[in-house]
Amino acid sequence: MHEPVRDARRLPHEQVAPEVLLLRGRAAPTAALVAQIEAVARAAPFRQLRTPGGGTMSVAMTNCGTWGWHSDARGYRYVECDPLSGSAWPAMPAPFRELAAAAAAEAGFPGFEPDACLVNRYEVGAQMGAHRDFDELDMRHPIVSVSIGLPALFLWHGATRGGSPRRVALHDGDVLVWGGAARAGYHAVRRIAPPDLLAGAAPGGTRPLRYNLTFRRAR
């Protein structure tokens, strides 16, 4: 059964865990970001990747930037070209790069220069299991995660996958940043519920989706 996500958009920035900071509404309004996502997807369409174990991810993905994250039977890795087209990934839009750098600096990680942006598209019912971002060469760089559209319940597990995670309601325009000792922390996203079961809804009458921009320094 879906758990209700409370409206927390008016709360100040939150310290989720040591070196994990939630910047409430930092990316709002998000209409321009959605337009840029759609432009990226025209060049590199969303696709549901296969896991090394043979499963299919419920979240659809694409990338922009110098490097793109990819998964198939060979494993998880970064690639310079879109496997579907053989072409380079679309360039990262300047507003994406600027948002990521500014949010990282605000969270205490100045000088962040992302070279990869993984764009996740969550339909209603999609989820992301507990995992950690561990495919980058230099773990000294933070991760910047931008939420757009439908609300979601984010789970921060930390150093181990088990136990009782910290639950954080994410809304349109929220930005989550983590790095330092928390850089390899386990995290997850609960199954996205239909809008009528949530305290929030998709902004501006848009299609009921959640987008997530995950900025990393891959190389």
Predicted regions and their residues:
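Non-heme Fe(II) oxygenase metal-center motifs and adjacent flexible, charged/small-residue loops
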Residues: 1-219
